[in-house]
Amino acid sequence: METSGEDGSAINHSELFSQLVNKDGQMNDTVASFLYYMFPRELFIRALSLIESCNMFIYVLVPSGVNDKNNQPLKFLEVSDLVNSIYDDSELHRLIVKPSDEDVPTYVDLNNWMCSCQEYTDLMLERLNQMEAGSLASSLLKDIDDSQRFQEDRFAQLDAHSLSMQRYVHCEKLNCPHLLAYSILLRSSTRTLQHFLEKGQILLIQINNMDEWLKLHINVVE
């Protein structure tokens, strides 16, 4: 998270992501071009292709309850409520990319900036091999402990709920299409996520049963 503008100020990736799709549902070509040149290895194009592939799943755990009046299960949350719960971190959610039944699914964890894909693993190993002194954390992380310098950017941010410190991953050192694609969806604005949901390119699935939730994790591990 070292990217800076011409005046030396930090770029707010979340703000850029939120402007990628305008209010008319059209791609903002100016913002898209800027993001294309911002990320190496054609990461932005690969992330957009991933979003358009219809292979990205967002699972949300909403524990089932019972309506005391008629003893009936509570209804599923509306899509807008699910989207808000993801942005508020009020419900557990899991991000999984699964191209086909034969392919191994890719597990993505934005909160801890981790991905199970080979590209992410290779970059992590490369950083480990390049280290001469110090720790991996000092090489990959940037801490901001001065509240006057706190940023609104949520992209590649860890410990997002801390009141005393902001911690970011140096995304120019450790990034992959899966992390970037989900960041565009979940570290921008609810309107951006709603746009791709309405186009049917992102699958948002509510899970009410804890057993099904645990099976989901087991399947990813397998």
Swiss-Prot record:
Plays a role in a RAD51/RAD54-dependent homologous recombination repair (HRR) pathway to repair MMS-induced lesions during S-phase. Required for error-free repair of spontaneous and induced DNA lesions to protect the genome from mutation. Its main location: nucleus. It comes from Zygosaccharomyces rouxii (strain ATCC 2623 / CBS 732 / NBRC 1130 / NCYC 568 / NRRL Y-229). Belongs to the SHU2 family. Keywords: DNA damage, DNA recombination, DNA repair, Nucleus. GO terms for biological process: DNA recombination; DNA repair. GO terms for cellular component: nucleus. It comes from the Eukaryota. This is Suppressor of hydroxyurea sensitivity protein 2. It is found in: Nucleus.
